[in-house]
Regions:
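Short loop/turn segments that connect beta-strands within beta-propeller blades
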Residues: 71-75, 135-139, 201-205, 245-249, ...
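Active-site-proximal cap/loop segments of hydrolase catalytic domains
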Residues: 373, 378-379, 386-548
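Beta-propeller fold detector
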Residues: 77-84, 142-147, 208-212, 252-263, ...
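Cap/lid segment of the alpha/beta-hydrolase catalytic domain
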Residues: 119, 301, 307-431, 438-439, ...
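Conserved beta-propeller blade repeats
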Residues: 1-20, 52-59, 65-66, 85-114, ...
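Predominantly five- to eight-bladed beta-propeller fold
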Residues: 22-85, 99, 114-117, 121-132, ...
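Glycine-rich His-Gly loop
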Residues: 22, 116, 284, 355-359, ...
Length: 548
């Protein structure tokens, strides 16, 4: 190959390989050295449309493309760019470039993949990715989500009536190659929508929603046989393994059985593999980094297979994790994890941290984080309070969706309900409460700094949103902010958007009265570092002790 290979997969017959390479797309040049050959040392970037940058990189007119090459005696022939040499988009999709979005059929004659074939402003406004299938024999590609010819320019009114206008990703072939299972979001522009489990019939081109009455995401999908699917779902602050018996090919959505939740317990199943009727899964808890467990497919019993970190655990002290259900201001029950320090003594008093989750649509689960690690925080003598406030998945769609357009509302009250509930404990030192969070959690910290009514003695905000108006012009995936804020700041007749911007944290800095630590990084293009600079400047000019 004439360039680096960034992922590959050999088909089962062993006669073909797909691979991913970054290619320069003619007409999409953004770097001055590419545009002006007589200026090879120039370093300017030139843009006439969105998106200039994405996640953590600038658009330089180079895209990841998917190639297929024949294999003979283990050697690859010249590859064919099945995306198209002039296609200014990525396969697998940006910004994570996950090669799990690419899947060979078991016969090795077809390749399914995810693509979002949009560019410019359309790309920034839309989540409309689709599943494509390339046939090796004919060289023909079919969009199984939109069988009509061509595509329309992004328009909210048009896409509302377009099949599959949201994210469609992660195709997985059934063992007999008749079906493709994939994950799909129904709402255009809503990146945190319910991940439905869909089944495409390659014979009839019919698509069936397999989880219409299941109120949770379906992720990490795998076939056990032609009539059984397994997947992972977030369930009440954990991730569990589920099994779904499939309907007959001519069944309608109304005859689909609910998935069976096979595993249970306070753990996260993060990934799994199946072979010979056995299941091996990666499992974490707040007290255990990833280990391998065998899962009994009948009753979900977990049997630990690996103990990679046993020698380390034998020499450190870990605190305990308690599950607490807190009553919210609107009479709901909210799961809150409480992490206690090692050698916890209820007769003593402990400084306590309120943890604010990012996302905002991310569950506070039994994850082992290598960044925001609750066990590490607790090891320093803190109690950590981690509520699953409004807006997180695993508690049903109503709980998840409430936060959209209401960043400053019920979820903020949920945070205060959690810390107030724990603060009533005699071992909680109410004079030493802190509040910490990253991303949306950083926004939460900034907002709470203006309304906490002297509950907290210190705040830590990591890459948080401070100023909604400047954020709208600085971020890149505008579909996200359009959905979560309700629209742009100039939409004066849009009450949801106007309510969001009226409650931006920067408008309440005059109420700040508590020291704050602000952490940021220049390669965060989702919430640029300028948000942190604005917050730091505002804090210091208001006389608030602050560190950046």
């Amino acid at each position: 190959f004439d360039a680096d290979v960034e992922g590959f997969g050999v088909n089962k017959p062993g006669d073909a390989i797909w691979y991913v390479q970054t290619v320069a797309v003619p007409g999409a040049e953004k770097c001055s050295a590419d545009l002006y050959k007589d200026m090879p040392r120039s370093k300017a970037h030139i843009y006439d449309d969105l998106m200039a940058r994405h996640w953590n990189y600038w658009d330089e007119g180079r895209y990841r493309h998917l190639f297929i090459a024949a294999l003979t005696d283990g050697k690859a022939a010249e590859g064919v760019d099945i995306v198209g040499a002039d296609a200014a988009w990525d396969v697998p999709t940006a910004p994570y470039f996950d090669t799990a979005e690419i899947a060979w059929s078991n016969a090795g004659d077809r390749l399914a993949y995810t693509c979002k074939p949009l560019a410019g402003t359309d790309y920034a406004l839309s989540t409309d990715s689709d599943i494509f299938v390339y046939d090796r024999a004919s060289g023909r590609t079919v969009n199984i989500c939109k069988p009509m010819e061509g595509r329309v320019r992004f328009n909210a009114m048009v896409h509302r009536n377009t099949p599959f206008p949201g994210y469609d990703k992660y195709p997985v072939w059934s063992p007999d190659d008749r079906y493709i299972a994939f994950r799909s979001m129904a709402t255009p522009g809503y990146e945190a929508d319910k991940e439905r489990l869909m089944r495409y019939d390659c014979r009839t081109a019919e698509i069936t929603d397999l989880t219409p009455s299941f109120d949770y995401h379906a992720t990490n999908v795998a076939w056990a046989d032609d009539r059984t699917l397994w997947f992972i779902a977030p369930m009440e602050g954990t991730y569990q393994l589920c099994r779904l018996a499939l309907p007959a090919p001519d069944a309608t959505c109304g005859t689909v059985d609910l998935p069976k939740v096979v595993t249970s317990g306070d753990h996260d199943i993060n990934a799994f593999t199946m072979a010979g009727g056995r299941i091996v899964a990666e499992v974490t808890t707040m007290r255990m980094a990833t280990e391998q467990f065998e899962v009994d497919p009948a009753d979900g019993k977990l049997t630990q297979l690996s103990a990679v970190n046993k020698e380390i655990y034998d020499h450190i002290r870990l605190g305990t994790v308690e599950k607490r259900w807190v009553e919210t201001t609107d009479g709901k029950r909210m799961l809150t994890w409480v992490v206690l320090p090692p050698d916890f003594d209820p007769a003593k008093k402990y400084p306590t941290l309120l943890f604010c989750e990012g996302g905002p649509q991310s569950v506070v689960s039994q994850a082992w984080s290598y960044r925001w690690n609750f066990a590490l925080m607790a090891s320093q003598g803190y109690v950590v309070v981690a509520p699953n406030r409004r807006g997180v998945p695993s508690f049903g769609q109503e709980w998840l969706e409430q936060i959209s357009g209401d960043y400053s509302g019920q979820n903020i009250r949920d945070y205060l309900s959690a810390i107030d509930d724990v603060a009533r404990e005699p071992w909680c030192d109410r004079d030493r409460l802190g509040c910490v969070g990253a991303s949306y959690g950083g926004y939460s910290v900034y907002f709470l700094a203006g309304c906490h009514q002297k509950r907290f003695k210190a705040f830590i905000a990591h890459c948080g949103i401070f100023n909604f108006e400047s954020m709208y012009g600085q971020t890149e995936e505008l579909f996200f902010i359009n959905h979560d804020y309700g629209g742009a700041y100039w939409e004066k007749d849009n009450p949801t958007a106007m309510r969001s911007y009226a409650n931006s944290p920067h408008k309440f800095v005059d109420r700040w009265d508590t020291p704050i630590l602000i952490v940021t990084g220049e390669y965060d293009f989702r919430i640029p570092y300028t948000q942190s600079l604005e917050a730091f400047t505002a804090a210091r000019l208001h006389g608030i002790p602050a560190r950046l």
